């Protein structure tokens, strides 16, 4: 479990989320055919953050389970799982959250063993993943992309385009360069 900028209450909260879904895996989901037995429950990369464009503060990370991988948003709480924050989304209701330059639809949910949270489905079912390491690598890359500065330049996806005339006449000039 990767955590940053966390105090004891927040670490306990993420651990509590993991424990709640471990219990669900062992009970409600135990014999369901959409479960990938090569995977386990893991909360990954939770950090305190604010969505961009003046959104609310909260904690965001990814929850990997044998049946889904979800982006999870935890609304602020009072002292160590105390009072619910007014920004908690009712179960089944949706809201849009912006991270970087991307909008995501989150759905309000609640588990008796944990309490309220919001999720955005990334993968379900999880049969695309051969093992926990591949699911973790995908989750880590998703978080890296979401947390990248919106102003950061994108990495090049292919070699620069060569000028066709230059190619035909043996010049090595790349389009946009001066001779």
UniProtKB/Swiss-Prot annotation:
Keyword Metal-binding: no
Key words, A-Z: Plasmid
Entry superkingdom: Bacteria
Protein name: Protein HoxT
Encoding gene per record: hoxT
């Amino acid at each position: 479990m990767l955590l940053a900028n966390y105090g004891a209450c927040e670490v306990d909260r993420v651990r509590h989320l993991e424990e709640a879904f471990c219990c669900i895996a062992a009970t409600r989901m135990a014999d369901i055919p959409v479960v990938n037995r090569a995977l386990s429950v893991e909360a990954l990369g939770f950090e305190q953050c604010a969505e961009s464009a003046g959104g609310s503060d909260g904690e965001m990370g990814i929850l990997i389970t044998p049946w889904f991988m979800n982006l999870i948003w935890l609304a602020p709480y009072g002292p160590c799982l105390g009072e619910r924050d007014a920004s908690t989304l009712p179960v089944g209701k949706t809201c849009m959250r912006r991270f970087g330059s991307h909008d995501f639809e989150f759905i309000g949910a609640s588990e008796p063993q944990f309490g309220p949270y919001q999720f955005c489905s990334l993968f379900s079912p999880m049969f695309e993943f051969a093992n926990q390491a591949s699911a973790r690598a995908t989750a880590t890359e998703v978080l890296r992309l979401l947390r990248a500065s919106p102003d950061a330049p994108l990495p090049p996806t292919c070699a620069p385009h060569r000028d066709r005339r230059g190619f035909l006449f043996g010049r090595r000039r790349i389009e946009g360069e001066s001779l």
